[in-house]
């Protein structure tokens, strides 16, 4: 058995001009139909924008979907609801880090584990300074009011790690004066316990959100236990009509166990800090232009401590470095006609060791009759080599260059029946070069990290939702991914179909997820196909008490996502929600 204890501390402080005012949403004169509020997003524009004006696709998972999923982690919810997105798992709860870990997030075949996908909380990047990957166990459901997923490169606005896309967790807040407290608790299979307590306050210009959680499980295998506790706090104050000041802290501590030999532990203390300034303005009718400046410093110190053998009690440095990134960008949106919006952006990004990268993007959004939308875009994504690739372990190479790719995309969507029926289709092609991979050293013996990889992915994504009546609704999504060079944890086919029922005191939802062509190994090739059936139900006893239950993998499918780590068969959880 091997256990890792990982504390994660994320701090944020921001001062916003214009954020305290009532949002001024963009409107179109083409149609008088009312569009849903979840079409207003902040990801992909740095300000509140009607998603119809953007030439890129942003998927939104709202608070209602998050709560009905009854999951302590956001990532399984995103796997169901967002086409093209997949998250690896190894057990009933928890992801861990390092050897045997899961929580790898991939979007269209590009993975956050290789720093090609960015996760943000309220627009602040969240990734390890040395290893460059997101910390999957830090993204818990109690944080989110909604999650916005930009499917495709977002490097113009967000820089290096947004090469494949962005997941932005928008945190909760009170809209009106008052106090709201919510307790969620449940117990189930394999001695699994999940708890969460959230308090939200708004009084005049002051607002706060304070949350805490404790989760643990014995796991479905010997030495697969997991324990996690953490908290989140956010304080805000409206200084003036157009000025908001807020600060937040997110602390997560988890103990992750997994089978394996005892080896010398790897310890590290990494950091990531920075400043992001931007100003969004309108100069004339139909115009919006954003100027921005970013500075980030990341790095850290990692070392091995020997616990046995002739070197017992000593340590050896692996890396002690830091790097800086400095960037400026401009993002332009212009309504050319009532039926056409033009988008363009350019970023100039300088890395203290690697050099300067120019990052353009361009797109068109056509607003057609019958609430149809057609979007076309071409955007560049890039990422700098991370410290691990340049300086750690025998394959390291300090002369690595940035990876880069182009994403070409065509998207069509429509709302029918006064918005009760919505559907969309995306076609995309990704062409990338200089991908970092470990290959035989051309100038000597052994292996070396090199810019020798290529990526050529193409696919189609479909999603639809239909509100049948005030009691019934159905939704689904499908994605097909063709990879010239297959990678692990990016399924060829991913399908989800779900339905929900709400009447009186009852809320019931169920869904089927089909995964096919999931590579768990590439040499030799091993793929997995499986079908998962989940069922969730909530009964409202009174205004302050709900009783809930959920079952996962009710077909008791035998499958693996991480090679060598079989997933649990059918599991059941039940619990209560208190609202006061």
Predicted regions and their residues:
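Extracytoplasmic beta-strand/coil segments of soluble accessory domains associated
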Residues: 76-124
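Flexible loop and strand-edge segments within Gram-negative outer membrane beta-barrel domains
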Residues: 217-230, 238-272
């Amino acid at each position: 058995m091997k256990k890792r204890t990982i504390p994660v501390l994320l701090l944020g402080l921001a001062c916003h001009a214009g954020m305290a005012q009532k949002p001024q949403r963009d409107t179109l004169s083409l149609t008088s139909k009312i569009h849903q509020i979840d079409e207003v997003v902040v990801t992909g524009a740095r300000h509140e924008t009607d998603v119809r004006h953007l030439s890129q696709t942003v998927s939104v998972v709202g608070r209602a979907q998050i709560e009905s999923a009854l999951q302590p982690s956001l990532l399984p919810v995103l796997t169901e609801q967002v086409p093209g997105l997949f998250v690896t798992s190894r057990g009933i709860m928890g992801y861990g880090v390092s050897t045997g870990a899961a929580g790898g997030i991939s979007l269209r075949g590009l993975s956050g584990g290789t720093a090609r996908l960015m996760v943000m909380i309220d627009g602040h990047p969240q990734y390890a300074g040395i290893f460059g990957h997101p910390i999957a166990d830090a993204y818990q459901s109690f944080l989110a009011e909604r999650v916005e997923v930009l499917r495709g490169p977002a490097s113009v606005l967000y820089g290096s790690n947004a090469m494949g896309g962005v997941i932005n967790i928008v945190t909760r807040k009170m809209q009106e004066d008052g106090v709201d407290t919510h307790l969620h608790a449940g117990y189930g299979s394999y001695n699994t316990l999940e708890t969460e307590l959230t308090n939200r306050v708004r009084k005049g210009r002051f607002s706060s959100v304070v949350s805490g959680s404790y989760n643990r499980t014995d796991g479905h295998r010997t030495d697969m236990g997991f324990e996690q506790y953490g908290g989140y706090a956010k304080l805000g104050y409206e200084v003036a009509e157009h000025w908001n000041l807020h600060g937040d802290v997110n602390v997560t501590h988890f103990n992750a166990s997994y089978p394996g030999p005892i080896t010398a532990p790897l310890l590290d203390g990494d950091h990531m800090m920075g400043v992001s300034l931007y100003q969004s303005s309108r100069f004339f009718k139909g115009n919006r232009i954003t100027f921005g400046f970013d500075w980030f410093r990341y790095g850290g110190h990692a070392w091995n401590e020997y616990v046995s053998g002739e070197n017992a009690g000593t340590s050896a440095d692996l890396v002690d470095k830091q790097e800086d990134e400095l960037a400026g960008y401009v993002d332009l949106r212009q309504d050319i006609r009532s039926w056409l919006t033009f988008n363009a952006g350019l970023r100039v990004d300088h890395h203290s060791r690697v050099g300067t990268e120019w990052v353009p993007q361009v797109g068109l959004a056509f607003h057609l009759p019958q609430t149809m939308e057609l979007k076309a875009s071409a955007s560049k994504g890039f990422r700098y080599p991370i410290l691990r690739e340049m300086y750690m372990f025998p394959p390291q190479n300090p002369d690595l260059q940035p990876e880069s790719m182009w994403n070409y995309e065509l998207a069509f969507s429509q709302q029918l029946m006064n918005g009760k029926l919505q559907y969309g289709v995306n076609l995309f092609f990704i062409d990338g070069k200089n991908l970092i991979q470990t290959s035989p050293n051309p100038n000597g013996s052994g292996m070396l990290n090199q810019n020798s990889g290529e990526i050529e992915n193409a696919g189609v994504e479909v999603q639809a939702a239909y509100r049948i009546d005030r009691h019934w609704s159905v939704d689904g999504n499908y994605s097909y991914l063709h990879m010239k060079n297959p990678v692990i944890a990016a399924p060829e086919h991913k399908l989800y179909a779900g339905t929900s029922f709400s009447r009186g005191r009852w809320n019931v939802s169920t869904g089927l997820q089909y995964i096919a062509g999931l590579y768990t190994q590439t040499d030799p090739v091993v793929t997995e196909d499986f079908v998962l059936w989940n069922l969730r139900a909530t009964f409202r006893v009174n205004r302050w008490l709900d009783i809930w239950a959920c079952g996962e993998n009710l077909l008791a499918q035998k499958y693996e996502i991480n090679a060598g780590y079989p997933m649990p068969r059918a599991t059941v959880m039940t619990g209560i929600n208190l609202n006061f």
